[in-house]
Amino acid sequence: KNMGRETFIAPMVWENGWPVVCPGTGKLDWAYPAPNLPEAPVEEIPETDDFDEKELAFCWNCLGTPAEGDFRLEDSCLKIRTTARPMEPTSPEVMGKIRSGMLPNVNCAGFVGRRQQHMSYTAVARMRFEPEESQTAGLILLQNNYHSLKAEMTCEKGKRILRVVKGYLTQEAEVTYHNVDMPYQKEICGEREWNSDTVILELKAEGQKNTFTAVEEDGTRHVLASELDGGFLGSETAGGFVGAYVG
């Protein structure tokens, strides 16, 4: 359920004053006979974006309301300010104070992404980044602040590193996600040194199997981590119902 709560059009009839959805089967089928209505074409969401427009397309979202300068479109690039954000759950007490105005909200994270639309897909991003010590940037499959899979570039002791990180509170569906006392954990699933400030990061998802690959400018490919289980990003484990983002 990494794509969250989806909406479907399904047949419905009334029986004894009660609505019955999908009568006869009680489940959604792949297709149903459509009524004879005029076509209403909808503009498809583009598969690629070279960021050469004046404004960001509506399919892209941020985490929180971005402030001026958090990102900009320039020279056919999306330039994002690196902004740290705590990778831990917000307690109900703190959330209540934020909503009442007693505490300021956390800064908008340095993130621009789009919703996961398919169970199997490939996401690719070309990135140029010159990290300082402990700074990171990359490509992430994000459910919330504390459940994610990401390939990131960072700097450690003066060396540029590419690594794949799994972050979570729990990977067990039977453990309630309302337990805010669970510590945030992260696992490094693969890493390697990288000699360039430019990398093409690729995430290939086949169902719940996620493979991250780093590609050099000349096309040379390096698998960073393969077939990582993304099941812990579903709502049963991570909570919520809005689905994952890629960005």
Model-identified regions with their sequence ranges:
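Structural motif
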Residues: 4-9
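Extracellular glycan-recognition regions
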Residues: 10, 17-247
